[in-house]
Amino acid sequence: MAPINPDLQNVQDDIKNVIQDLFQVLVQVSNYDAAGRPTRDVLAQDIQTLDKTLHTLHTNAQHLPTPTADKPIPEPLIQYVENGRNPDIYTREFAELVRRMNQLARGKMHAFRDFRDVLAREMESALPELRADVQMVVGATGGRTVGGEGEGAGQGEGGEGRGEGGN
């Protein structure tokens, strides 16, 4: 559980005190005797205590950060709501946009991964003296290489397992 902000804790305590003082005033009002002097003084004292507690609450509440300081609301969402539209629709459209962008990025990642493997295979077949360097680069970029000769290097086990580690 996240730690509670000390200012927030003070405000919570002040609210509890206000509720307690309101209860005390309620008790004094329900037992009020217009002819009796002690009840009038006690009620006045409880109202003054309530006033001080409310003042303390107001002072401590001024030190709290604004809610938007922690979680800013996107300006397009504010405009969307001000134009009388449903924020749930905005959220759904935003989620769909993010999903499409993620699919596009994933497609690019797969295309580059496949290009890396094809390029490595072609470089190994055309420049066999660079095979160790090519395998080192493919391994460093998340690909799997098979130490075999010719066209099979870069396919086989590595080609089948790409969907697991490269995503």
Swiss-Prot record:
GO biological process terms, semicolon-separated: regulation of transcription by RNA polymerase II
Cellular component terms per the entry's GO annotation: mediator complex
A GO molecular-function descriptor: transcription coregulator activity
InterPro entries assigned: Mediator_Med10
Main location per the UniProt record: nucleus
Keyword field: Activator, Nucleus, Transcription, Transcription regulation
Subcellular location: Nucleus
Compositional bias of kind Gly residues: 141-158
Region (Disordered): 141-167
Cross-referenced PANTHER family: MEDIATOR OF RNA POLYMERASE II TRANSCRIPTION SUBUNIT 10 (PTHR13345:SF13)
General function of this protein: Component of the Mediator complex, a coactivator involved in the regulated transcription of nearly all RNA polymerase II-dependent genes. Mediator functions as a bridge to convey information from gene-specific regulatory proteins to the basal RNA polymerase II transcription machinery. Mediator is recruited to promoters by direct interactions with regulatory proteins and serves as a scaffold for the assembly of a functional preinitiation complex with RNA polymerase II and the general transcription factors.
Assembly mode: Component of the Mediator complex.
Family of this protein: Belongs to the Mediator complex subunit 10 family.
Protein name: Mediator of RNA polymerase II transcription subunit 10
Species per Swiss-Prot/TrEMBL record: Chaetomium globosum (strain ATCC 6205 / CBS 148.51 / DSM 1962 / NBRC 6347 / NRRL 1970) (Soil fungus)
Taxonomic lineage: Eukaryota, Fungi, Dikarya, Ascomycota, Pezizomycotina
